[in-house]
Amino acid sequence: MASRKEGTGSTATSSSSTAGAAGKGKGKGGSGDSAVKQVQIDGLVVLKIIKHYQEEGQGTEVVQGVLLGLVVEDRLEITNCFPFPQHTEDDADFDEVQYQMEMMRSLRHVNIDHLHVGWYQSTYYGSFVTRALLDSQFSYQHAIEESVVLIYDPIKTAQGSLSLKAYRLTPKLMEVCKEKDFSPEALKKANITFEYMFEEVPIVIKNSHLINVLMWELEKKSAVADKHELLSLASSNHLGKNLQLLMDRVDEMSQDIVKYNTYMRNTSKQQQQKHQYQQRRQQENMQRQSRGEPPLPEEDLSKLFKPPQPPARMDSLLIAGQINTYCQNIKEFTAQNLGKLFMAQALQEYNN
């Protein structure tokens, strides 16, 4: 089950009954060591997610919901979904877990797939690499190994290209999250970088044959668009917003680097003080020995020199991952527009 946090992500706490139910939907390849290699989504699910955002999403406000389906060998089939209702902190009487249980029970009564296989969330200009999403996906994936999170980008979709991606946490990151040790040494030992925190799973959208025939007929009847529109440049607002968000994350990364450098300087300074103290003790013991006096008693250096608390590095990895996402968005945007500029220049030279 999942408990929703307004506007940030959902913190999931899955029950054993849900995990057991998902296990019943597994095929031959549904053993614990298998990985989901493909996500198959019904077209109805995609439309429900889009409709949910259009009805309740506003600006930076995200919408979230539950994904239902089953696992067949190494393929996760998402056949239905339902949204988390929008509510505020004033709605103290609203029980999110009870709401999900009632929804799944109702779906089971009408013979619709009701097995919990993940969740979905909208994003604002690709801003989804957050601690809330990490904690939520870990809870889902820890209870149901095949769980995925679908990230829907309404801004890209509004520009004419459906943006829907499925992500899972990598096995290395799952182990680190289980240990709950995000110190620099632990992350270095696990060899985790921002590039290997999430793994993207390919998505295939499936429709019935009747829907495919209908789409084919509608495509034939639709008017042919003006070919010159293909060379129109996209709005610069998208690029400007991504650059602004990128600069904000770079500032956060800079502040985090300053904190880490301060920790390293304090650690180095303490090591020097500890070494100097040991040398003084050793010299004093040698002098006492030459005078025939007993050496000084041993002292617990860990009490005298308490090591500084290392800063958690998980937030730094998340910021780096979000910076990488913004860079990829900017790269994709500029590549498309530069291609159009070169094509327009070539056509102009040809016509002249």
Swiss-Prot record:
Positions bearing the Glycyl lysine isopeptide (Lys-Gly) (interchain with G-Cter in SUMO2) cross-link: K303
Main location per the UniProt record: cytoplasm
Pfam families in the cross-refs: eIF3h_C, JAB
Residue positions where Phosphoserine is found in the record: S3, S183
The organism's place on the tree of life at top rank: Eukaryota
Residue spans of biased composition, Gly residues class: 22-32
Location(s), subcellular: Cytoplasm
GO biological process terms, semicolon-separated: formation of cytoplasmic translation initiation complex; negative regulation of proteasomal ubiquitin-dependent protein catabolic process; regulation of translational initiation; translational initiation
Family annotation (InterPro entries): eIF3h, eIF3h_C, JAMM/MPN+_dom, JAMM_MPN+_peptidase_M67A, MPN
Annotated keywords: Cytoplasm, Initiation factor, Isopeptide bond, Phosphoprotein, Protein biosynthesis, Ubl conjugation
Gene Ontology CC: one annotated term: eukaryotic translation initiation factor 3 complex
Residue ranges occupied by any MPN domain in the UniProt entry: 39-173
Biased composition (Low complexity): 8-21, 270-289
GO molecular function: metal-dependent deubiquitinase activity; metallopeptidase activity; RNA binding; translation initiation factor activity
Region span, Disordered: 1-34, 265-310
Family (UniProt): Belongs to the eIF-3 subunit H family.
Record function comment: Component of the eukaryotic translation initiation factor 3 (eIF-3) complex, which is required for several steps in the initiation of protein synthesis. The eIF-3 complex associates with the 40S ribosome and facilitates the recruitment of eIF-1, eIF-1A, eIF-2:GTP:methionyl-tRNAi and eIF-5 to form the 43S pre-initiation complex (43S PIC). The eIF-3 complex stimulates mRNA recruitment to the 43S PIC and scanning of the mRNA for AUG recognition.
Subunit structure: Component of the eukaryotic translation initiation factor 3 (eIF-3) complex, which is composed of 13 subunits: EIF3A, EIF3B, EIF3C, EIF3D, EIF3E, EIF3F, EIF3G, EIF3H, EIF3I, EIF3J, EIF3K, EIF3L and EIF3M. The eIF-3 complex appears to include 3 stable modules: module A is composed of EIF3A, EIF3B, EIF3G and EIF3I; module B is composed of EIF3F, EIF3H, and EIF3M; and module C is composed of EIF3C, EIF3D, EIF3E, EIF3K and EIF3L. EIF3C of module C binds EIF3B of module A and EIF3H of module B, thereby linking the three modules. EIF3J is a labile subunit that binds to the eIF-3 complex via EIF3B.
Protein name per the record: Eukaryotic translation initiation factor 3 subunit H
Species name: Homo sapiens
Gene from which the chain derives: EIF3H
